[in-house]
């Protein structure tokens, strides 16, 4: 009789748990990003959303709005903060001075690759995101494969050659570097690069290789430095109130999809896409893809040293020790074998 009672009680418990799961309030999360649906990051976002749907037994649906449908690329952090969207893809480098800690990632000659480098970035930035992005719920961060500088009318070999050029910088730190070299910055999100180059508003742009082809930038550029100069960090954030409104089991699902492992999964196809673009552009007639010699590369590295000093000052203003932050980043990159 005791065994029967225990069996009945177990069955009732299972039934109640199943009923509770079935009655869990379904939620649809609006996810906005600014790259076109042909971009590999979009496909990775779709796979991420499908995994969330499956893990939540259908109680969380993720609806994705690509290509700046809901707002400009520069506005995506505020869109998540203000509840215009539930999840957004943020490029912190599009807002100079606002996120100085994560700006360490933008310093030249730091990252060797975008795959393990993304797992390292996410692992490192989790220790600081709560302070720097405190008005949103941090999910994960990653980076593209290293990018370089591309020019429309002038072959640039040495930093001194940048003087007088108009450059679309990929992020805030590179913008500071270009200013120190005597160039003028022209702000434009990635989908707008071709337009500013074609109209002569800019003479050069920072971009990873595959994105050149995706946005048609190779059609208006001719000279390309064949050296990995920089990366730009990308961050996914959630609206705080929306995350707080989720049930405990739904929060668990989201937490399991906001990890360094997922950062790598999202970054990997993008990294492959970007690195593959280099050989395609190099094979095109009329394109000059040229390496930097040892002395030339040393000159570029020397020219970037003041940029680090400016970054350090911005981190001090944010109340952090820049040496500790930078050493932490370097160590994490080394742990993931992804440092320059």
Predicted regions and their residues:
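Bacterial N-terminal signal peptides that target proteins for export
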Residues: 1-9
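N-terminal secretory/targeting leader peptides
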Residues: 11, 23-116, 124, 131-340
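N-terminal signal peptide c-region/cleavage motif recognized by signal peptidases
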Residues: 17-20
